[in-house]
Design a protein with these regions (language model features):
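Residues that define the transmembrane beta-barrel architecture of outer-membrane proteins
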Residues: 16-18, 24-32, 81-86, 138-142, ...
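Predominantly the C-terminal beta-signal and adjacent terminal strand-loop region
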Residues: 47, 275, 288-291, 295-324
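Outer membrane beta-barrel
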Residues: 29-164, 254-261, 267, 272-285
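Outer-membrane beta-barrel translocator domains and adjoining extracellular loop/strand segments
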Residues: 18-26, 58-63, 113-119, 168-180, ...
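Outer-membrane beta-barrel pore domains and translocons
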Residues: 11-17, 50-54, 105-107, 160-164, ...
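Transmembrane beta-strand segments of Gram-negative outer membrane beta-barrel proteins
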Residues: 2-21, 43-47, 55, 122-123, ...
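Membrane-embedded hairpin module used as a gating/binding unit in multi-pass transport
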Residues: 146, 158-215
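Detector for outer-membrane/organellar transmembrane beta-barrel domains
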Residues: 42, 151-157, 195-285, 295
Length: 324
């Protein structure tokens, strides 16, 4: 294998945000992504390295976590910015249009996907338009993804088996902790999804389960597993596209037990317009003074500058996240 056999891709994202809140400081964050794929006769290697700057402890992303899904993507055990290998996996090309990916994976990339609301670097910046708030995804973790491509008689199927805790979920944020699979506090994340993909429309439904125990609200020792269902509808025609998301989770242990989101995108001569609104509902057993349902909304306009590889994206958001 030579350097010519490796396909490289990457990008840099810088975000400046100011909030209409005297208690919150303006914040500048930055991140970088580098992908390397190596094609082999039986499959493909994928490596993903990402880095992010240190967040401002009094900045916008600290007080309003959903408004910048690109912030805090890589943190050290002390809470500072860092660099890490987030994906390192191999995809086997199996017979009958099937693939099997194993290694260090991103579970959220395989469930609850949308054509216009899934990537904070080139689409909506607000995290509520990247993934469903009710799905308790692990961070980058060890696991496997079996994908069965669809055809005219069946939908595309995705099956996931992964660790319940990823790098950012662990106290030391280390690969050594990630490999410690004997911890009593850990379990597995199971996910299944079905997708019907057409030229103009797409339908996705799925279910997920975490086997690690969560303490039921109001109890000190009674536990249950968190689980849920999700659905995504997509539509596109000409310059217009629409994305609708919903989800439910176990209200006994999940703070966010219901979610609904709507996103719209329109291509114009000058750039890409996006408008979205999402509502995250708090479970009744977790509701208390100062904690209530959350609202996220965003309008952005992505403008290419000096070609198609550079963009400037003004974004206005209105959020309410009491107690989240």
């Amino acid at each position: 294998m030579s350097a010519a056999d490796v396909d490289w891709a990457g990008g840099v994202t810088a975000v400046y945000q100011h909030a209409d809140d005297s208690n919150v400081e303006s914040e500048l964050t930055a991140s970088a992504d580098l992908f390397a794929t190596i094609a082999r006769p039986t499959g493909e290697w994928l490596f993903y390295i990402e880095a992010s700057s240190s967040p401002n402890p009094n900045g916008v992303s600290a007080f309003y976590p959903t408004v910048n899904a690109d912030a805090r993507s890589v943190l050290t055990r002390n809470g500072g910015g860092g660099i890490q290998i987030s994906k390192a996996n191999y995809t086997f090309y199996l017979h009958d249009s099937r693939t099997l990916m194993v290694g260090l994976i991103d579970v959220s990339a395989w469930l609850d996907r949308g054509r216009i609301a899934n990537d904070e670097n080139i689409q909506f910046l607000n995290g509520s338009f990247v993934n469903n708030a009710t799905i308790e995804f692990p961070d980058y973790t060890l696991g496997g993804v079996l994908r069965i491509l669809g055809n005219q008689s069946r939908p595309e199927l995705t099956l996931i088996l992964a660790g319940s805790d990823g790098i950012a979920d662990l106290p030391d944020r280390s690969y050594q902790d990630l490999l410690d699979l004997t911890s009593d506090e850990r379990g597995v994340f199971l996910g299944v999804g079905a997708s019907w993909l057409y030229d103009r429309t797409s339908w996705r439904i799925g279910a997920w389960l975490r086997t690690d125990d969560d303490v039921i609200a109001g109890s000190e020792s009674v536990t249950e597993t968190n689980h849920g269902l999700y659905g995504v509808y997509g539509w596109q025609a000409g310059a217009n596209a629409l994305n609708v998301r919903f989800g439910i989770a176990n209200s006994a242990v999940a703070i966010a037990d219901r979610f609904a989101g709507l996103a719209y995108q329109r291509k114009t001569r000058l750039g890409l317009l996006g408008i979205g609104v999402a509502r995250t509902y708090i479970s009744p057993v977790f509701r208390e003074p100062g904690r209530d349902n959350a609202l996220d909304s965003e309008i952005y306009f992505r403008v290419p500058v000096f070609g198609e590889t550079r963009h400037i994206t003004p974004s206005i958001q209105y959020v309410e996240n009491p107690g989240f």
